[in-house]
C-alpha cells in the first residue's frame, strides 16, 4: 500500500500522447494529490499573507540589528557577514515586494472578452469541425490569426519527443506544429513524418537553441508562435488561455509556468520546489511592473516583436531573459499567465541540475556586467530597472552560503569573530530566527510543507554560482546543455568535487572546534555552525552516492538507448554551411536561402509539406 501511495504521490510526467481532442476545452485530470491541492487553492491564502507580512517585519528588524555599530566584531569576518547578509536581505525584500504586488490580480475584462470571441461556434458548425477542436480557427479583433508551434529538439529520447508532439498537435485551435531538430536525427525526421507534423533541421549549429528557433522562423511564417522544449507536454487549452492576450497589439509574449511531473528524487524535488515559488508568486507580481520575462519554453510570441529586435537573441546561452529585456527596452509589453498549461521534467541528477544552474546564473551575471539594467543607457522604466537588477543579482544569494562557511572557520583557527561578545545569545535568538526562520516558514507555507531538499541544494550550489560569476566576468563560453534532461553516464561526483573537499575540511574543523570547546570548558556558537555546515555538505555527498547507485542499477536492468546530446543519430548535414548568422539575427530569417539549401541536401524530401509552404 505504501508503495502504491508513493507512486501516486510522485507520478511522472503526465502522458498526453493519447489525448482526446473531442472534448471541448477539456483538461487531462491526471494530478497527484499535491498538484490537485495547488490547483484548487488560491495563491494568496490569509495564512500566506500573514506570514509574508511577518517575514517583512523580520527583514527590517534583522537589518537594523546587524547594522548596529556597537555589535561589530573583527573586520574580515564582519565584512563577509555584512556582504552576504545584505545580499540576502535585498533579495528577500524584493521577493516579498514582488509577491505582494501581485495580490488579488485577476485577468482583465479585455482578456475575458477576447477569450470569449476566440472561437466561432457557428462557423465551426457550418464547417462541420465542431468535433475536432484542433481545426477551430482562432480570431482576435474580428480577424483570423494563425499560430505555429515550435518544438526544439536536441537529442532527447524519441518517446519523450513523441509525447510532446502529440500533445502539441492536440491543442485546441488551428495551428501548425513543427519539430526543430538540432540533433540531426533521421529517427526524429521519420517520427515527424509518421505523426504528420512539419520538420526542419539546419546546416550548422550557431546560436544554440536561439539559432535553431531563428532558423525555423525563416519557414514558419505565422503571426504568432509557441515554443516548447522537447520534454514539456502541453495541455489542450494552452492556446485558449494565451492567445487572447495578443488582442493587445503591444504584447510581445505570454509566458506560462514551468510545472514538473518528475519530482521523484532529492534533486528533482529540490529543483522543482525552488522554481515553484518563482512561478506562483514572483512572475505574477512582475506583471505589475511589466517585467515578467521569458523562460525559454511554454511561451507564446508575437512574430513582429521578435522581428523588431532582430530575432531571438543568440549571443548568450540564456537567450530567454536577454530576448525579454531587449523587448522591454523597445517598449513591448509582456504577460505572465499563471495557469499551469504544460508539464515537463526538472533536472533529476546532480549533473543536469549543475549544468542548468550554471547556464541560468551565467546569463544573469552577463546582463549585470554587460547590460546592467541600472545603466542610464538602458531604455527601461525605473521599476523595470529594479526588477531586472534583482534578477541578475539573484545568484549572489547562491554564493553567500559558501562565503558564510568561512566565518566559523575563521573563529575556530584564528579567533576572529563577526560580532562582539557583548551580543547576548537571546538577542541572536530574537533577531536571527526572525529573519531566516520566517523565510523558511514562508517557503513552507507556499509549498504546503517543509522542503528540506530546497535547503540542501541551496546550501551546496555555491561552486556552481562562483563558476558562473567568473565565466561571465571573463567571458568564458559554456557548452550548451538541455534543461530538464537527465545527464549522461558520468558520476555525480564529477560535478561536485568542491563540495566533497569542503565536507572533508569542515568535518575536520568541527572536530577541532569540539576539542577546543572541551578544553575551554564552554560551547562556542562556531561549533554549532561547523556542525550544521558539515551536515548539509555530508547530506549532499550521500545524495551523490545514492544517485550513482540508482543509476548503476538502472544500467544493469537495461541498456541505455538515449542518444548523446548534440551528436547526430545519422550522418550529419554539411557542417560547413551555416543557415544562421552568428552575429546578425535578420539573416536567420532568409526563407528562400534556407529552403534552397535544405532542398539541395534532401532535408525536405521526406516532408513535402515544407515544399508546399515554400510555394
What residues fall within each predicted segment?
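Cell-envelope/extracellular polymer assembly enzymes that use nucleotide-activated donors
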Residues: 146-148, 176, 322
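Long helical/loop segments within the catalytic core of UDP-sugar-dependent glycosyltransferases
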Residues: 201-224, 236-317, 328-329, 350-390
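Short, acidic, metal-binding catalytic loop of nucleotide-sugar glycosyltransferases
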Residues: 142, 164-175
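A conserved acidic beta->alpha catalytic loop
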Residues: 181-188, 204-205
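Catalytic donor-sugar/metal-binding loop of nucleotide-sugar-dependent glycosyltransferases
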Residues: 324-342
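The conserved acidic donor/metal-binding loop of glycosyltransferases
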Residues: 229-233
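Membrane-embedded multi-pass helical conduit in multi-pass membrane proteins
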Residues: 58-107, 394-479, 493-564
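N-terminal membrane-anchoring/stem segments of glycan-assembly enzymes
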Residues: 2-137, 192, 387, 397-398, ...
Amino acid at each position: 500500500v505504501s508503495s502504491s501511495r508513493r507512486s501516486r504521490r510522485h507520478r511522472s510526467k503526465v502522458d498526453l500522447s493519447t489525448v482526446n481532442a473531442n472534448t471541448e476545452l477539456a483538461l487531462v485530470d491526471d494530478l497527484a494529490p499535491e498538484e490537485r491541492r495547488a490547483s484548487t487553492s488560491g495563491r494568496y491564502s490569509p495564512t500566506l499573507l500573514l506570514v509574508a507580512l511577518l517575514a517583512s517585519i523580520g527583514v527590517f528588524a534583522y537589518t537594523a540589528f546587524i547594522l548596529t555599530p556597537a555589535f561589530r566584531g573583527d573586520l574580515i569576518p564582519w565584512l563577509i557577514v555584512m556582504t552576504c547578509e545584505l545580499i540576502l536581505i535585498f533579495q528577500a525584500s524584493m521577493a516579498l515586494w514582488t509577491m505582494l504586488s501581485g495580490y488579488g490580480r485577476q485577468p482583465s475584462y479585455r482578456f475575458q472578452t477576447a477569450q470569449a470571441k476566440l472561437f466561432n461556434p457557428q462557423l465551426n458548425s457550418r464547417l462541420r469541425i465542431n468535433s475536432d477542436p484542433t481545426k477551430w480557427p482562432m480570431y482576435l479583433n474580428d480577424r483570423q490569426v494563425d499560430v505555429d508551434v515550435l518544438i526544439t529538439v536536441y537529442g532527447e529520447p524519441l518517446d519523450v519527443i513523441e509525447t510532446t508532439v502529440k500533445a502539441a498537435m492536440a491543442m485546441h485551435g488551428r495551428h501548425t506544429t513543427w519539430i526543430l531538430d538540432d540533433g540531426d536525427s533521421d529517427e526524429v525526421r521519420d517520427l515527424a513524418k509518421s505523426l504528420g507534423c512539419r520538420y526542419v533541421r539546419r546546416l550548422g549549429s550557431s546560436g544554440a537553441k536561439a539559432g535553431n528557433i531563428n532558423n525555423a522562423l525563416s519557414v514558419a511564417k505565422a503571426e504568432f508562435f509557441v515554443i516548447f522544449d522537447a520534454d514539456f507536454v502541453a495541455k489542450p487549452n494552452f492556446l485558449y488561455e494565451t492567445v487572447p492576450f495578443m488582442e493587445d497589439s503591444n504584447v510581445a509574449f505570454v509566458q506560462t509556468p514551468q510545472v514538473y511531473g518528475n519530482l521523484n528524487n532529492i534533486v528533482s524535488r529540490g529543483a522543482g520546489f525552488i522554481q515553484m515559488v518563482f512561478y506562483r508568486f514572483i512572475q505574477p507580481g512582475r506583471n505589475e511592473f511589466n517585467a515578467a520575462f521569458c523562460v525559454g519554453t511554454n511561451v507564446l510570441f508575437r512574430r513582429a516583436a521578435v522581428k523588431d529586435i532582430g530575432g531571438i537573441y543568440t549571443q548568450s546561452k540564456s537567450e530567454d531573459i536577454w530576448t525579454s529585456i531587449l523587448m522591454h527596452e523597445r517598449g513591448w509589453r509582456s504577460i505572465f499567465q499563471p495557469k499551469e498549461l504544460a508539464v515537463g521534467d526538472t533536472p533529476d541528477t546532480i549533473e543536469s541540475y549543475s549544468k542548468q544552474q550554471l547556464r541560468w546564473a551565467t546569463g544573469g551575471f552577463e546582463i549585470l556586467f554587460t547590460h546592467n539594467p541600472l545603466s542610464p543607457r538602458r531604455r527601461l522604466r525605473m521599476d523595470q530597472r529594479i526588477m531586472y537588477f534583482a534578477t541578475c543579482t539573484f545568484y549572489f544569494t547562491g554564493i553567500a552560503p559558501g562565503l558564510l562557511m568561512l566565518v566559523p572557520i575563521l573563529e575556530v583557527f584564528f579567533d576572529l569573530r563577526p560580532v562582539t561578545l557583548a551580543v547576548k545569545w537571546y538577542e541572536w535568538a530574537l533577531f536571527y530566527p526572525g529573519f531566516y526562520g520566517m523565510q523558511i516558514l514562508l517557503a513552507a507555507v507556499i509549498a504546503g510543507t517543509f522542503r528540506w531538499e530546497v535547503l540542501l541544494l541551496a546550501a551546496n550550489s555555491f561552486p556552481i554560482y562562483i563558476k558562473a560569476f567568473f565565466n561571465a566576468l571573463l567571458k568564458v563560453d559554456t557548452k550548451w546543455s538541455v534543461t530538464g534532461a537527465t545527464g549522461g553516464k558520468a558520476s555525480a561526483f564529477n560535478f561536485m568535487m568542491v563540495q566533497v573537499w569542503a565536507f572533508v575540511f569542515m568535518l575536520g574543523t568541527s572536530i577541532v572546534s569540539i576539542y577546543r570547546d572541551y578544553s575551554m570548558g564552554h560551547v562556542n556558537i562556531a561549533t554549532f555552525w561547523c556542525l550544521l555546515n558539515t551536515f548539509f555538505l555530508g547530506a549532499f555527498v550521500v545524495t551523490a552516492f545514492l544517485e550513482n547507485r540508482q543509476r548503476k542499477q538502472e544500467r544493469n536492468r537495461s541498456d541505455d538507448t538515449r542518444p548523446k546530446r548534440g551528436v547526430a543519430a545519422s550522418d550529419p548535414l554539411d557542417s560547413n554551411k551555416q543557415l544562421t548568422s552568428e552575429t546578425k539575427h535578420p539573416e536567420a530569417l532568409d526563407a528562400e536561402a534556407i529552403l534552397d539549401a535544405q532542398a539541395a541536401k534532401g532535408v525536405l524530401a521526406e516532408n513535402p509539406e515544407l515544399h508546399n509552404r515554400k510555394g
